[in-house]
Amino acid sequence: MLSWAITFLIIAIVAAVLGFGGIAGAATGIAKILFIVFLVLFVASFFFGRGRG
């Protein structure tokens, strides 16, 4: 799943260089959503993992 986030991030960066529009805007939106999802999962695993010792 992390590879998908990195793939969409690279597509979004290339799209930003070429100008946002069409599929570029969609890739940027997907990259933002995946970034937020992984950030939430990271924070959750950090706090729940601390209890295990």
Curated annotation (Swiss-Prot):
Family listed: Belongs to the UPF0391 family.
The keyword Transmembrane helix belongs to this UniProt entry's keyword annotation: yes
Domain of life of the native organism: Bacteria
Membrane topology of the entry: Multi-pass membrane protein
Residues that span the membrane, as ranges: 4-24, 29-49
Main localization category: membrane
Organism: Pseudomonas putida (strain ATCC 47054 / DSM 6125 / CFBP 8728 / NCIMB 11950 / KT2440)
The protein's name in its UniProt record: UPF0391 membrane protein PP_0135
Localization: Cell membrane
Keywords from the UniProt entry: Cell membrane, Membrane, Transmembrane, Transmembrane helix
A single cellular component GO annotation: plasma membrane
InterPro entries in UniProt: DUF1328
